Each structure stands twice: as structure tokens, then as C-alpha cells.
Amino acid sequence: MATKEELIQELSDSIISCKKDAVLAAVEKAKQVMEPAEIIENGLAAGMNQVGVLFERGKLFLPHVMMAADAMTAGVKVLEADMPAGAATKKLGVIVNGTVEGDVHDIGKSIVSTMLQSAGFEVHDIGRDVPIKNFVEKAKEVNANMIGISALMTTTLQGQREVIELLKEEGLRSRVKVMVGGAPATQAWADKIGADCYAENASEAVAKAKELLL
């Protein structure tokens, strides 16, 4: 019988291999001894984070990243089916998540969306290169409690501030929390623009969202 550490490694490696079959096989094995949230967080998401690092270093290319993301989604779907009915139906909150206009990076934000969803939040992922007004319009449409704004470049960081300003103009700021993230974002930046929180990675995003919304 494989140890938990070995199973976690196998899950992570299966994501990096970009092979859906390998991911599903690893998930089936891990399910026997691990909770779904742990499989996603410590295994699949860790692998996806590694894929992101390899992509940034030019060791993997976009098609690999897309295949790895598809494989992860397939693994998460299997686990969602196994989660207790209550976990699937009881929504902790409604979150709109996207990457700001001018920024085509998607990996980190997608991992955050997947992790938030698996933690029990209703997540509306509006993609990448999203115009400022779309964040606010979507939040209104789905009656969101929180907006997650990712920016991966210093040039697009300003978009996070603009979303907050627009929320204020629309009179929504008091009821919609704002979480910012992405490589150039910091806690100091979040404080400066008046965001409710900053999350360095997907696990932290889940913890902060629970802190703010529960």
C-alpha cells in the first residue's frame, strides 16, 4: 500500500504529465485513504502549481498547460461526485473570479477558482483579459459576496484598484468583498487600494475567503 506522501506525489506527477488517464487512476487510488479536499489541495493543485512554474520557465508550453488543466478538472469532477451531498449543495458564498484586462495569464487564477469551488463556494470564473466593468456587472448578476481579481504583471495591477473604485461608484463596495492576488500583488498593495485581503496562493485564497464570508 502506498503511503500518503507517495500518493500525493503520484497525484502531482500525474498532473505534470498532462495525462487525464494517469490523473484519474491516481485519484481513484488516493480516494481510498484521503479526503477529496486533501487530494485536490495537496496533490492536484500542487501539480498544477508546478506546471505553472515550468511554463513560466519555458520548460512547458501552453498546450501542455491546457491539457494539465483539463486533466485536473476531470480529477476534481470525480471527487465532487464523492463529496457528501451537503458539501455540494451548501454554498459558503458566491465569488466572481477573473484576471484583469490586458493580462492573458490564466493558470493561477484557474487553480484558485477550482480550489474555491471544491471548498464549497459558488464560483463564477469570468476568464482572463476581463474589462473592469465586467467584474462589477457579473457580481451584480449573480449577487456575489466577493470578487477575486488576479493580475500577473505590474502593468495590469492598476486594474485591481479600478475594480474597487467602480464598486464604490455603483454603491456595492460595502456588500462585496475584494480579494487580490497575482505575482506583483502584495499585502501592502492590497492595503493601499483598499482591498479586503491579499492571497499569495490558492490555499490562502480559500482560507481568506472563509475568514471574510463565514
Swiss-Prot record:
The keyword Metal-binding applies. SUPFAM superfamilies: Cobalamin (vitamin B12)-binding domain (SSF52242), Methionine synthase domain (SSF47644). SMART domains: B12-binding_2. Signal peptide: none annotated. Methylcob(III)alamin binds at H105. One of its GO terms (biological process) is homocysteine metabolic process. Residues 92-214 form the B12-binding domain. CDD domains: corrinoid_protein_B12-BD. GO terms for cellular component: cytosol. Keywords: Cobalt, Metal-binding, Methanogenesis, Repeat. One of its GO terms (molecular function) is methionine synthase activity. Residues 1-91 form the B12-binding N-terminal domain. InterPro entries: Cbl-bd_cap, Cobalamin-bd, Cobalamin-bd_sf, Corrinoid_p, Dimeth_corrin_MtbC, Met_Synthase/Corrinoid, Meth_synthase_dom. Pathway: One-carbon metabolism; methanogenesis from dimethylamine. Belongs to the methylamine corrinoid protein family. Acts as a methyl group carrier between MtbB and MtbA. NCBIfam families: dimeth_corrin_MtbC, pyl_corrinoid. This is Dimethylamine corrinoid protein 2. It comes from Methanosarcina mazei (strain ATCC BAA-159 / DSM 3647 / Goe1 / Go1 / JCM 11833 / OCM 88) (Methanosarcina frisia).
